[in-house]
């Protein structure tokens, strides 16, 4: 049995974290899996443990146990996950004098990361200095790989492995959708536009709500659905100031949710307004659920979904309105037909089984 240690920045709700969860679920019992996370409340802890993995938050005891394991099993795979996770994995590797096979995975856009704070810029430059140490570095897109090379990353084995999802989880669940629609008091004939994601400047919720305001005034059958941490209407009062109370009642804020497949089952048009994304797992999940999607033109896989994915320039809320209306004016049957074609493409290119096989091949070949 091969010991596999994931060192992750966190295991809370997020794209990189959900990929880790899906990857661990998919790996076979050839691997004895241990997950160490640095920050957060550990949202996915119970789900990860249910797979048989051991899960620890970083502390002196878990650190000592991991060091002891590396000394005892020097062929352990040491897989970093996100910047801080990569640093932790490297720290363990150096502390044990090179024991373990060190790998990194980079999930974020460097350009976006360095502009968040000086601390993030320093972390990026520091990881660039250490980037020769891993046996290989995985990036989630070719664009992210090129970005990090421009910031000084150097390694003989830099590979792109796309994020994958368990496509079976996102099959449309009409029964669950009906229950949610009923609980939210949304008419069955409504067109539902929605998004999923925490409130963060990169997500650009201002553009989302600017366009929502225009759309909801123009289309009385439109309802807006938002599932994400720290999103509340008071933060966007300027964008929504012209709406009546009836129109505001058609905006539904659900907060942070774990039942994303069920929520996507009732969304007709999924919108991504992010100004920077390394991959956007939420968009792939929406496509896997058969949603028609509108996104900023920063996504590298738009060519795979010519009908189901329409793009607009970042910040351009008026273009976003036109893109959404393209799908509003379609019949439900037309949207469903487009959605079914998108599902087949996701299954072909972005399944978790393909991602898992790519990682297993990497760990065994380098």
Which residues make up each language-model segment?
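Short, structured helix-loop element that forms part of the nucleotide-activated donor/catalytic region
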Residues: 41-49, 225-249
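A conserved mid-protein helix/loop that constitutes part of the nucleotide-sugar donor-binding site
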Residues: 14-25, 191, 195-214, 318
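Conserved acidic donor-binding segment of nucleotide-sugar-dependent glycosyltransferases
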Residues: 309-318, 327-332
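Aromatic "clamp/platform" in nucleotide-sugar-dependent glycosyltransferases that forms part
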Residues: 256, 275
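Short hydrophobic beta-strand element within catalytic cores of glycosyltransferases
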Residues: 37, 292-295
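Short His-centered aromatic/hydrophobic patch
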Residues: 80-88, 106
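A short, active-site helix/loop in glycosyltransferases that binds the activated sugar's phosphate group
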Residues: 133-158, 165-169
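N-terminal strand-loop element at the rim of the active site
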Residues: 6-61, 144, 151, 232
């Amino acid at each position: 049995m091969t010991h596999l240690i994931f060192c992750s920045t966190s295991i809370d709700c997020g794209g990189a974290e959900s990929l880790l969860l899906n990857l661990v679920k998919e790996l076979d019992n050839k691997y004895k899996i241990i997950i160490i996370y640095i920050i957060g409340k550990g949202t996915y802890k119970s789900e990860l443990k249910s797979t048989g993995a051991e899960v620890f938050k970083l502390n002196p005891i878990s650190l000592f146990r991991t060091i002891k394991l590396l000394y005892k099993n020097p062929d352990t795979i040491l897989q970093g996950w996100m910047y801080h996770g990569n640093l932790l994995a490297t720290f363990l590797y150096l502390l044990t004098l090179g024991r373990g096979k060190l790998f990194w995975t980079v999930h974020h856009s460097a350009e976006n990361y360095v502009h968040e704070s000086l601390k993030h810029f320093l972390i990026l430059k520091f990881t660039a200095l250490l980037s020769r140490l891993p046996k290989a570095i995985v990036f989630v897109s070719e664009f992210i790989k090129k970005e990090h090379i421009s910031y000084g990353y150097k390694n003989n084995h830099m590979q792109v492995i796309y994020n994958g999802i368990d496509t079976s989880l996102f099959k449309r669940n009409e029964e669950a959708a009906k229950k949610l629609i009923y609980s939210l008091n949304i008419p069955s004939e409504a067109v539902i536009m929605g998004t999923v994601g925490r409130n963060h400047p990169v997500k650009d919720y201002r553009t989302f709500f600017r366009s929502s305001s225009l759309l909801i005034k123009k289309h009385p059958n439109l309802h807006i659905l938002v599932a994400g941490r720290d999103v509340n209407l008071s933060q966007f009062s300027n964008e929504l100031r012209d709406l009546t109370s009836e129109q505001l009642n058609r905006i539904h804020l659900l907060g942070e949710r774990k039942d994303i497949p069920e929520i996507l089952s009732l969304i007709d048009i999924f919108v991504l307004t992010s100004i920077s994304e390394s991959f956007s797992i939420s968009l792939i999940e929406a496509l896997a659920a058969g949603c028609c999607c509108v996104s900023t033109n920063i996504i590298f896989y738009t060519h795979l979904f010519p009908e189901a994915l329409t793009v607009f320039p970042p910040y351009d809320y008026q273009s976003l309105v036109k893109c959404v209306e393209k799908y509003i004016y379609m019949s439900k049957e037309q949207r469903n037909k487009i959605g079914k074609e998108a599902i087949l493409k996701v299954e072909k290119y972005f399944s978790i089984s393909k991602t898992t096989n790519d990682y297993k091949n990497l760990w065994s070949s380098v």
